Each structure stands twice: as structure tokens, then as C-alpha cells.
């Protein structure tokens, strides 16, 4: 079986979580009567917008990190560790929608995979370079 299937599934889950926050941010416009293109509105509306924007900011690091780690280290490990990111981002968004201080647990779950992926891939690639010397 092609091992890229597993990080591929995790990538799709990450994109679905991003789309969920995008959708929720759009729905919040109607809920809080904020007309496009404005992002000004009540604090509750801002929580929806920030959950979406922050997820986008992290997605840019998560997806390439996931795939770099998958190719440099292991596809299965990448997928297993990577599952933490969509779960954490979902908890982050749902918490943020309730109150800003309730986003923390989701952030703490979703951040480590990014660090593990980037640092792990860098170490693995460096080791491969040194093996060739």
C-alpha cells in the first residue's frame, strides 16, 4: 500500500478544519451583522475571525511540515503525529468561539506537531547529508 495515503488523509482533515473555521467566520458575519468587507465588530465576532485567521497562519506551517517529515522520516509517524493538529485546531476554534481564554488547550495540542515536523525533518535531512560524506 502506498504510505502517502496516510499523510494525505491527515492533510485533507487539516484542510477540512480550515474550511470549518472559514465557514464559521462567514456565518458569524450574519450572526453579528458585520457587513463585508469590514472585519470590525463585537468581540464575539472577532473571536470567530481570529480563529479562522490563526488557523490559516498555522496551516501554512503544518502542511509543508507534515510532508517534509513524511518524506524525511516516516509517513506513518507523520500521519500519527499530524492527527493532533486538526484535533487541536478544532478544540482551539470551538474554545475561541466561547471565549478567548478557552482557546489555550487547542493551541497547546496543535503547536507541537509543527515543531516536531520542522525540526525532525531538518535533522533527518541533515543526517542524510552527513551519511553521503
Report the location of each language-model feature.
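N-terminal signal-anchor transmembrane alpha helix
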Residues: 2-33
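Membrane-embedded alpha-helical transmembrane segments of multi-pass integral membrane proteins
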Residues: 14-17, 21, 84-92, 113-123
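Cytosolic, membrane-interface loops and tails of multi-pass inner-membrane proteins
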Residues: 23-50
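Core segments of transmembrane alpha-helices
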Residues: 54-66
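Alpha-helical transmembrane segments of multipass membrane proteins
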Residues: 65-68, 90-94, 125
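Short alpha-helical packing/oligomerization segments
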Residues: 66-87
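Interfacial loop-to-transmembrane junctions
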Residues: 91-116
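Juxtamembrane boundary at the C-terminal end of a transmembrane helix
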Residues: 122-133
